[in-house]
Amino acid sequence: MTRVRPEKQAVVEQLREWIDQSKGMVFFSFEGLTSKDMQAMRADMKRNGLTVKVVKNTLLELAVKEVGLNVDESLFRGTTALLFSNEDELAPFKLFVEQVKKYGVLQAKGGILEGRWISAKEVDAIAKLPGRQELYAQLVGVVSSPMRGLVTVLSGPYRNLVYVLQAIKEKKEKAA
């Protein structure tokens, strides 16, 4: 094993901790992004509860090996930054795709979802998946729809009776 200085070992430990504890993580290249745009992107991510960290590839490689992930070797080439969340597993993927549209120069290198390596191609596909809240809303709609239909069907005869009685009342009032 390569000998690593204590301060760098601390960085490797921090990276390993982020990888272990994050619900979702995207690795990306930010080559061509201005420092002003990088600061704006970090602020935007922070507002959304995400963290962006620029990392050294050699230290990232050590952390990934310690975790035991089989990743694409291209991850360790060029500039690398991490985007991760400890709360929502899909948020890093969705917000990364938004940032790609906004800045254009960002390129996905891959990601981690539920402890599994995600290729760069899969990052876009995962970003299109509905989030937890959207799935809950869809489930509520699916469950409540038959009940609403049943209520409508059962209340139909009573509603018709009320209309008939109203018509009789109006007819008697006109006759009187």
From Swiss-Prot:
The keyword RNA-binding is assigned to this record: yes
Keywords assigned: Ribonucleoprotein, Ribosomal protein, RNA-binding, rRNA-binding
SUPFAM superfamilies registered for this protein in UniProt: Ribosomal protein L10-like
Ribonucleoprotein is among the record's keywords: yes
GO cellular component, one term: ribosome
GO MF annotation: an example: large ribosomal subunit rRNA binding
GO-annotated biological processes: translation
Gene3D superfamilies: 3.30.70.1730, 6.10.250.290
Functional summary from the UniProt entry: Forms part of the ribosomal stalk, playing a central role in the interaction of the ribosome with GTP-bound translation factors.
Assembly description: Part of the ribosomal stalk of the 50S ribosomal subunit. The N-terminus interacts with L11 and the large rRNA to form the base of the stalk. The C-terminus forms an elongated spine to which L12 dimers bind in a sequential fashion forming a multimeric L10(L12)X complex.
Family classification: Belongs to the universal ribosomal protein uL10 family.
Record's protein name: Large ribosomal subunit protein uL10
Species of the source: Coprothermobacter proteolyticus (strain ATCC 35245 / DSM 5265 / OCM 4 / BT)
Gene: rplJ
